[in-house]
Amino acid sequence: MAKVSVLNVAVLENPSPFHSPFRFEISFECSEALSDDLEWKIIYVGSAESEEFDQILDSVLVGPVPAGRHMFVFQADAPNPSLIPETDAVGVTVVLITCTYHGQEFIRVGYYVNNEYPDPELRENPPPKPDFSQLQRNILASNPRVTRFHINWDNNPDSLEAIENQDPNVDFSLSLSCTPVKSLGLPSCIPGLLPENSMDCI
């Protein structure tokens, strides 16, 4: 049984200019005290073509964590535009929030992100080179994809084999804040950005 349950993730200040920080309010509950830190990460998927363009925007250690409910605001700087392929700068991508314990990832929350020019003229006639200063970032907060993974919470060698034989599963009990946003008109190829074993969780 998982010792940490993520209760809620709220996307703050959305939509925002591309260069604005990402901000998420995360609530979670520990069924018992954790002696070691939880490591939270925000990862920006720079391109669906290769993980080499993924950017870890920030990583924070939280702990030791006592039993009970906890909440914090996780803020990370915007991705480095120079590391994003120009062909992937405008359009739909993904931002991930992950959490690990003892180096084992036990939850991943993914959001589709649409980067577009709010100026109609720029949308119709985009510049040859992406102008990130004019882009707006819109996170599809109403449609997160949540995947949970079985991990060895106690570092007990006897349970490692059993855990390795278990597949990731979807946690339908996770209640995430749903902030209505305009439809992003996701192209049919975009779902491949998120793991196949992840599903919509409302």
Swiss-Prot record:
One of its GO terms (biological process) is nucleosome assembly. Its main location: nucleus. InterPro entries: ASF1-like (IPR006818), ASF1-like_sf (IPR036747). The keyword Nucleus applies. GO terms for molecular function: histone binding; histone chaperone activity. GO terms for cellular component: chromatin; cytosol; nucleoplasm; protein-containing complex. Keywords: Chaperone, Chromatin regulator, Cytoplasm, Nucleus, Phosphoprotein, Transcription, Transcription regulation. Phosphorylated by TLK2. Phosphorylated by TLK1. The keyword Transmembrane helix does not apply. PANTHER family: ANTI-SILENCING PROTEIN 1, HISTONE CHAPERONE ASF1B. Interacts with histone H3 (via C-terminus), including histone H3.1, H3.2 and H3.3, and histone H4; the interaction with H3 is direct. Interacts with the CHAF1A, CHAF1B and RBBP4 subunits of the CAF-1 complex. Interacts with HAT1, NASP and TAF1. Found in a soluble complex with NASP and histones H3 and H4; the interaction with NASP is probably indirect and mediated by H3-H4. Interacts with CDAN1. Found in a cytosolic complex with CDAN1, ASF1A, IPO4 and histones H3.1 and H4. Interacts with CREBBP. Belongs to the ASF1 family. This is Histone chaperone ASF1B. The gene is Asf1b.
